[in-house]
Amino acid sequence: DEKKLNDEETLNNKDQNIKLSPDDEFQRAFDMLRNQNFEEAKFAFQQFIKNNKDNSLSGSAHYWMGEIFLLQKSYREAALVLAEGYSKFPKSVKAPDLLYKLADALIKIDKKMDSCNTLSKFIEEFSNNRLIEKVKKKIIDQDCQVAIE
């Protein structure tokens, strides 16, 4: 067993020393998430963001990290990661999703006004997005004082 463990450690160390392309690094983190290895995925997404500050996938990495925090009921951490993702990558393909999930995280930490403002921002920025009806429903459910035409 000790020999096997050492072989696994060597394999893991070799993997860490291989420089992956940003796409491969993101895919590796996403595969960990898909396999429900949440802690490893969270760490891998953090590393991806650190290593690829300007990569177009960094917004998506923030989104998936936020999702992991939401799954783990770490709502404050989710809100921080999702807000950072949106503020740094407002043009990301995941920007609407970042705002949508940010509103969820904010309501969970009793930040109703911030959640409502986030939903309002969603409507301003992404009025034709596939999530718009869900956003409007959330605004009504949370009794936000926001125009939803």
What name fits each language-model region?
Residues N51-L57, K88-K94, I123-V135:
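Short solvent-exposed coil/turn linkers within tandem alpha-helical repeat scaffolds
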Residues D1-N35:
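Acidic, proline-/serine-/threonine-rich low-complexity intrinsically disordered segments
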